[in-house]
Amino acid sequence: MEAKAVGKHLRISARKARLVADEVRGYDYKEAIDILRFTNKAASSMIINLLNSAVANAIQMNESLDPNSLFVKKIYVDDGPIMKRFRPRARGRASRIRKRLSHITVVVSEIEKKVS
């Protein structure tokens, strides 16, 4: 069983968010939260919220599910729209500032137990 959480229009560049997302891909839920909690990046708090939301969605689908039996199956960061702002420069000119947004998707799944 899979559960998904999507964060859209998050105010961080996709390039910076991918650095953090790549750190937790494949880890189980508890370990991923521990890694993110000690990662000193702005994207880590956003990904923690999305990971908690994905786990809550999984529990919503199956009440008897243990959160510790979930792992991060997929996590990916896509580019969002770009907010364009202008900064005044010398001689009456202006420079464009591009504030980048991103969409982050987290998919959690149950750890499959091996039957022997």
Swiss-Prot record:
It comes from the Bacteria. GO terms for biological process: translation. InterPro entries: Ribosomal_uL22, Ribosomal_uL22_bac/chlpt-type, Ribosomal_uL22_bac/org-type, Ribosomal_uL22_CS, Ribosomal_uL22_sf. SUPFAM superfamilies: Ribosomal protein L22. One of its GO terms (molecular function) is structural constituent of ribosome. Transmembrane segments: none annotated. This protein binds specifically to 23S rRNA; its binding is stimulated by other ribosomal proteins, e.g. L4, L17, and L20. It is important during the early stages of 50S assembly. It makes multiple contacts with different domains of the 23S rRNA in the assembled 50S subunit and ribosome. This is Large ribosomal subunit protein uL22. The lineage of its organism: Bacteria, Pseudomonadati, Spirochaetota, Spirochaetia, Leptospirales.
